[in-house]
């Protein structure tokens, strides 16, 4: 996204409200939902999202490394979401949430340049013993995806081979 687009959006968004107002939490917490076709801000090629969860012990240095890598790649994210997950273990066989910090970032898709960035971010996540959110992933390595799903083999016992998806084809690749 061009810097002037981000500046214009931020200026318009923050000027729209005058004074204090009471409002429902939904539009406050999901501001992009109020903008029709917001995904077009990323251009014709769209965007990819990278979301990871980092264990508490490695979260801070890994976050610094992720942000440093993004800066060195001269990239930025129009939308960033940082949350701390609680201490409950994953409940489902393919659950993403687990104790730690999660960071979600949107990047305009720029072909090989974006693929290299995601590969570099994934290396940091793997080194930190983190995980990738498969439901939001389009570019991560199959091995890291498998590591992100520690109960995948248990889930496979219930899988119907007649059903398939891009995620499953990627997970089965290079096995």
Language model region names:
Residues 1-175:
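Noncatalytic alpha-helical scaffold of FAD-dependent oxidoreductases
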